[in-house]
Structures are given as structure tokens and as C-alpha cells.
Amino acid sequence: EFDLPTIMGYMHAIQDNAADTVSRMLDRIIAKHGIENIHCVDHMDDGSAICLHLRKNQENGKIIFDFTGTSPQAYNNLNAPHAITYSAIIYCLRCMVDEDIPLNQGCIRPIEVVIPKSSLLDPDSGCAVVGGNVCTSQRVTDTILKAFHVMADSQGCCNNFTFGNDGFGYYETIAGGHGASAHWSGVSGIQTNMTNTRITDAEVFEKRYPIILRDFSIRDNSGGNGLFKGGNGVRREIEFRIPVNASILSERRAIAPHGMEGGEDGSRGVNLWIRNVGDKKQVINIGGKASVDVSSGDRIIILTPGGGGWGEPSAHTPESQRKKVVYPVGAGSLSIRKKQQYE
């Protein structure tokens, strides 16, 4: 219906509009806070730092996202190729824009990015990177949103859990708490930021795999308190009916999701192995990253992190908060809907 020049013209116009919209948004935030105050340092559980500060390129007017100071590449799998940082940036920019624009390359036209070579965010060839996509990306996102004074930390992790043997394998990511902001409380039991996965239905899970799902519930009071509360994480308990190898790749087990503007931190996550030893049960904290051989009857309990709160808790009253916040209808059971709507 349209020739190529017309189509290309529309495509360029969409990107031009996105660039102008993001540029206006950045100008507003910088005018409000001052570019010198838009900076943040956060850490992975192993202590690796992710540093961000903004500055302006005086020659072309672009805003520079400078990650200088970020830790060197790590001797683990949390290294993140630089494309992951770009993905986190474009995601955050689109989230901060309050206009209806499609996500496209124009969103990052008004910015430049500086990432140190051989760092956690731009590792050398040959470095392990599987955790960079599912863990480090979440920390980069938290760092950007905090630097812009937009939102407290979310759970900061995908809670990657796998198990299997030579005959089968299973992989899931587990929801947690969303961080609060200046205008709303965080949502409980939700996949946050750099992930869009959905967990297997309980009935399907138990039918197709040799497990019993003993518990999958909201982890009460795990979100940080505040004028607006962080969302709660979840509790997931799986009992195995045959011996398998189980692995967990997770973050926010050592460093809690931070609150903002006086809001309290969310609760750290915990991964437990309930091991049968004779007629006794051992409770073992397996840490954020582990691989264990579980026996029939053993259980793995994963408590995911809550989101950070926003604002001084003393300023919070249920009545005033409900006037300010429109709670979404919670997915799932009536019990979860009640928690989301009224608690």
C-alpha cells in the first residue's frame, strides 16, 4: 500500500518522536534534582559494585550514563555483556517516560554510555555470563531507577531454580516484591523489571514432574515499610519424590533491596534445603548460588526478597494510603486478590 520511502519516513518519525520525548523527560528530572545529584552505587551479593553517575556532553548536549567505578569482571557467572546494560537503560528510560510511545531505538538517541572495559558490565571474551542476564541486569536496573530518584529497589533477581536428572530438566523463575515509589506501593509476588517469565501452574507442575508443591504463598511482611510499602516476596516449597540435582541462581540473599526517602529495606531472600538424615531433618541454608543432590522426600524452600519501601513509615496510615494508591486486582486465588486489594 505504501512505498519504501514512505515506510522509512514513518519509521524515522517514530524514532524522532521517542528521542524528543526521552530528551524532555531527562531535562525535567535533571532540572528537578540537578545532574550532580543523579548518581548511585549498588552492590551484588559478592560485593561487586555497580556505579553510575550522569554528566552532560558539552559538545552535543547528550546525557552520559557513566559506569566508571564499576568492579572488574568477576570469577563467577555474573558478568554482563555491555548489551545487557543498554537493555536495562532503554527499559528504564521507557518506564520513566509518562507519554504513550512505542519502545524503539530512538529512546537511547539522547544519551551516551560509558562502560569500563574488562569490568563486570563489559567482560572479556571467555568470561562466564549466564547470571549477567538474569541477576546483574536487575541490579543495573535498580541502580538506574534509584539514581533518578524514581523507585526503591525491587527484588533484584529472577530467582532461577532448576532441577532434573539424565532423563529430564525443569527451569523456573520465581516472583518477588516490587519496590515502592513516591506515588504507590509495590506489588507483591510479581516478576519485576528485566524479566517477563510466567511460572508453571501448580496442577501442571505436580502432574508432569516428580514433585509435590507444598507451599506457594505470599511472604507476609517481607516488603519494606514506609509511607508506601514495598511489595512482599513469595514462599515456595517443593518436595521431591525422586533423587534429583537441584540448583539455584539468585541474588539479594546478602544485600537487602534498599528503601528510599526514609523507607525501610525489603527482606533479603533465603534458600533452604530441608534434608532427611535418618529420622531427623536438617535445615541447611544453601546460599544464593548452589547446586545440591537432593533425595526423595527432601524439600527446597525459596523465600524471595521483598521490595524496598518509600518514605518515612511514621507518615503512613492505611486510610491516607488508600486514597493515593489504586491497587491492581491480584492474579490467582481469591486469597491473593484479597491481599492485593485490601492489605
Q: What positions do the PLM features span?
A:
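Glycine/proline-enriched, intrinsically flexible loops and inter-domain linkers
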Residues: 1-343
